[in-house]
Amino acid sequence: MAVKVVMPKLGMAMKQGEVSIWNKKVGDPVEKGESIASIQSEKIEMEIEAPEKGTLIDIKVKEGEEVPPGTAICYIGDANESVQEEAGAPVAEDNMPQAVQPVKQENKPAASKKDRMKISPVARKIAEKAGLDLKQLKGTGPGGRIVKDDVTKALAEQKKDQAKPVSEQKAQEIPVTGMRKVIAARMQESLANSAQLTITMKADITKLATLQKQLSPTAEERYGTKLTITHFVSRAAVLALQAHPVLNSFYQNERIITHPHVHLGMAVALENGLVVPVIRHAEKLSLIELAQSISENAKKAREGRAGSEELQGSTFSITNLGAFGVEHFTPILNPPETGILGIGASYDTPVYQGEEIVRSTILPLSLTFDHRACDGAPAAAFLKAMKTYLEEPAALIL
Amino acid sequence: MTLAIIGGGPAGYAAAVSAAQQGRNVLLIDKGKLGGTCLNEGCIPTKSLLESANVLDKIKHADSFGIELPAGAISVDWSKMQSRKQQVVSQLVQGVQYLMKKNQIQVVKGTASFLSERKLLIEGENGKEIREADQVLIASGSEPIELPFAPFDGEWILDSKDALSLSEIPSSLVIVGGGVIGCEYAGLFARLGSQVTIIETADRLIPAEDEDIARLFQEKLEEDGVEVHTSSRLGRVDQTAKTAIWKSGQREFKTKADYVLVAIGRKPRLDGLQLEQAGVDFSPKGIPVNGHMQTNVPHIYACGDAIGGIQLAHAAFHEGIIAASHASGRDVKINEKHVPRCIYTSPEIACIGMTERQARSIYGDVKIGEFSFSANGKALIKQQAEGKVKIMAEPEFGEIVGVSMIGPDVTELIGQAAAIMNGEMTADMAEHFIAAHPTLSETLHEALLSTIGLAVHA
């Protein structure tokens, strides 16, 4: 009996999941626990593992197609077995709320003759490896069959096109799917549905920089984690948020919900998007524990191992463009949060201290807040608190 | 719109039929018999005689199949072999004549030469005439290359045509050149009882194909009694003593023989065409053409052996049809990526695409799949279990880039390889393919499987 593999439900709110890549094709043998596909939903990308050893006997969801959780995406069984399709809608998983019952999927008939593509096996393999869109290819073989020459010519064209000055290049169309789609929707929703604005401040972190240099090697030796300026800033944010809970809040249903705890979202850039892993109860963590969590979460996120729970529920977010040399910027709120802090690139500059000019290290901070939840003065007070923590850093260590 | 075609060989007559089918008014000029070298002096007559040798071989081994023949029961009648050959040739020539008639192609016997771009002078038995044509296709073919110090005399120094119609089976024969033609003739006459000596300048026979194939073949040829001297060169000939004097390294050897067959290649037959008068570019290597078979003068086409290159009848058919179609307004181009190369020796050799050496030089670590006929049921039944099938697959995508075979009936098997390669199939597809059993085709299937490590009987 073939085993059905379904689109998993990653988080309560998940309505659709996309199969981004099939790592196996029909007919391939699979080992139990072997990765058979990558799926994407919201901001999560996840590998699907084979539940049983066997042969991948049928693929129901094509690459790039979105289906509700619980929908069968493929079947694993004996090589010569055929799939017994279940009648009706795919069965929802037990823990799936009724509201998100998956829509019944149409059983599409096998591709009709018209849809069938005339292409030689060699041409198909080369095109697929190079990621060429087969539909864009024109076949010059018998009866319009796409042959190897057509593919190699198209690849050469593509290369030539890329080598051309930008003005002569053809515009590229990239369909917005998966993570990009989620980011696009979230960011637009954020800007459309809130009254956000950004204020900036500069903190003199000369002392902090010295402290960080002193502590980091010891921290690494003792706890296995380097201490970075970001870690100190995060700690400062946690402390400042506790003193100014209006920025540690959600603006939801015409209510402002302030949180007693700080779940800190730390934005992590990925190759094809970004995720915001969440450090729960950051207020309970010491500086070193916070640093460890931040490092561990970022690593997991980059490796695509972050689970859906770890990417949800933040009460305040921090984003850092300092590594790219950006100083001040306007971060976009991660709704329903009402505050997000942007860390810029620190720089050394002469600063007056009394009549004396000294070399100081300056860290640019940008705070975006939702004016519906909080006015300028309390937001500035929060930033001021941050500045104070950063300029007198001894308190951060405690 | 008249299309004049010079030469009625495979390139010329195929072009004539194709053009006529496309509604053209076609004039075909040939100085000899229709069918050209292939039909009259090449492919067909040689293979016909070779078939006689094959039958003889079979009969000689009749006892191993359980058939007893009384002593002295076998005798070879060369003149009957000749007349059988002639019958086959005549029937095929008549076939071509019928095709000309059926397609209303005007055939003129004579020698053609250009007077200008569109004017041809035809000199025939009934005198001279001048014909005009809107387009001209040159398919004048090729002729054997002579050795300057030993020109063909038709008496003792022979070309391949002369050797086909000897009055008797020679008791001894020196063959200069161990390429395709030399090897086919060596096998023929050796199996009919001649003492054959091959003198080849390269370090092995059939230098164009892979070494493993050539070596296997040479062993077999030597078993048949042929003396093979590679890395050797004919120095001179002594006509009166009927002796060929040849060198291997610094040493000189003498071989006395009834005949010397010079088979060192063929050259385009362009003399007398007066190509200059039409402004057509050419060199001793042939007439350069583009992918539509057009010469530098766009309304003058050339194809077949006249353009040099592949020099195979089946390539000529293809070229002729492309030339005729393009001349008739169709935008077609030549595709000679997959031209089978057959050698009718015993055992036969058939190759297509790249040799292993070529494939390695282009793709580096190619996947090689081999299967031996000694593990094939049908080959054992036929008692022809010598040889192998070798397949070269490109390493990344598994494209079959070359097939080389030596063994029973491989000149027929190569058709399957041609279909596979022309269809751009990949090695892994062999898994989903069933070869009939017991057949020689199974070797091809097993060799394909072996490129992906899945051969069953190896």
Swiss-Prot record, chain A:
<dbReference type="Pfam" id="PF00198">
    <property type="entry name" value="2-oxoacid_dh"/>
</dbReference>
<dbReference type="InterPro" id="IPR004167">
    <property type="entry name" value="PSBD"/>
</dbReference>
<comment type="pathway">
    <text>Ketone degradation; acetoin degradation.</text>
</comment>
<dbReference type="GO" id="GO:0045150">
    <property type="term" value="P:acetoin catabolic process"/>
</dbReference>
<dbReference type="GO" id="GO:0004742">
    <property type="term" value="F:dihydrolipoyllysine-residue acetyltransferase activity"/>
</dbReference>
<dbReference type="InterPro" id="IPR001078">
    <property type="entry name" value="2-oxoacid_DH_actylTfrase"/>
</dbReference>
<keyword id="KW-0006">Acetoin catabolism</keyword>
<feature type="domain" description="Lipoyl-binding">
    <location>
        <begin position="2"/>
        <end position="77"/>
    </location>
</feature>
<dbReference type="InterPro" id="IPR023213">
    <property type="entry name" value="CAT-like_dom_sf"/>
</dbReference>
<dbReference type="InterPro" id="IPR011053">
    <property type="entry name" value="Single_hybrid_motif"/>
</dbReference>
<feature type="modified residue" description="N6-lipoyllysine">
    <location>
        <position position="43"/>
    </location>
</feature>
<keyword id="KW-0450">Lipoyl</keyword>
<dbReference type="InterPro" id="IPR000089">
    <property type="entry name" value="Biotin_lipoyl"/>
</dbReference>
<feature type="active site">
    <location>
        <position position="371"/>
    </location>
</feature>
<feature type="active site">
    <location>
        <position position="375"/>
    </location>
</feature>
<dbReference type="Pfam" id="PF02817">
    <property type="entry name" value="E3_binding"/>
</dbReference>
<dbReference type="Pfam" id="PF00364">
    <property type="entry name" value="Biotin_lipoyl"/>
</dbReference>
<keyword id="KW-0808">Transferase</keyword>
<dbReference type="InterPro" id="IPR036625">
    <property type="entry name" value="E3-bd_dom_sf"/>
</dbReference>
<protein>
    <recommendedName>
        <fullName>Dihydrolipoyllysine-residue acetyltransferase component of acetoin cleaving system</fullName>
        <ecNumber>2.3.1.12</ecNumber>
    </recommendedName>
</protein>
<keyword id="KW-0012">Acyltransferase</keyword>
<comment type="similarity">
    <text>Belongs to the 2-oxoacid dehydrogenase family.</text>
</comment>
UniProtKB/Swiss-Prot annotation, chain B:
<dbReference type="GO" id="GO:0006090">
    <property type="term" value="P:pyruvate metabolic process"/>
</dbReference>
<dbReference type="Pfam" id="PF02852">
    <property type="entry name" value="Pyr_redox_dim"/>
</dbReference>
<feature type="binding site">
    <location>
        <position position="200"/>
    </location>
    <ligand>
        <name>NAD(+)</name>
    </ligand>
</feature>
<feature type="binding site">
    <location>
        <position position="305"/>
    </location>
    <ligand>
        <name>FAD</name>
    </ligand>
</feature>
<dbReference type="InterPro" id="IPR012999">
    <property type="entry name" value="Pyr_OxRdtase_I_AS"/>
</dbReference>
<comment type="subunit">
    <text>Homodimer.</text>
</comment>
<protein>
    <recommendedName>
        <fullName>Dihydrolipoyl dehydrogenase</fullName>
        <ecNumber>1.8.1.4</ecNumber>
    </recommendedName>
</protein>
<keyword id="KW-0520">NAD</keyword>
<keyword id="KW-0676">Redox-active center</keyword>
<feature type="disulfide bond" description="Redox-active">
    <location>
        <begin position="38"/>
        <end position="43"/>
    </location>
</feature>
<keyword id="KW-1015">Disulfide bond</keyword>
<dbReference type="InterPro" id="IPR004099">
    <property type="entry name" value="Pyr_nucl-diS_OxRdtase_dimer"/>
</dbReference>
<dbReference type="InterPro" id="IPR023753">
    <property type="entry name" value="FAD/NAD-binding_dom"/>
</dbReference>
<dbReference type="GO" id="GO:0006103">
    <property type="term" value="P:2-oxoglutarate metabolic process"/>
</dbReference>
<keyword id="KW-0274">FAD</keyword>
<dbReference type="InterPro" id="IPR001100">
    <property type="entry name" value="Pyr_nuc-diS_OxRdtase"/>
</dbReference>
<feature type="binding site">
    <location>
        <position position="313"/>
    </location>
    <ligand>
        <name>FAD</name>
    </ligand>
</feature>
<keyword id="KW-0006">Acetoin catabolism</keyword>
<dbReference type="InterPro" id="IPR050151">
    <property type="entry name" value="Class-I_Pyr_Nuc-Dis_Oxidored"/>
</dbReference>
<feature type="binding site">
    <location>
        <begin position="30"/>
        <end position="38"/>
    </location>
    <ligand>
        <name>FAD</name>
    </ligand>
</feature>
<dbReference type="GO" id="GO:0004148">
    <property type="term" value="F:dihydrolipoyl dehydrogenase (NADH) activity"/>
</dbReference>
<dbReference type="InterPro" id="IPR006258">
    <property type="entry name" value="Lipoamide_DH"/>
</dbReference>
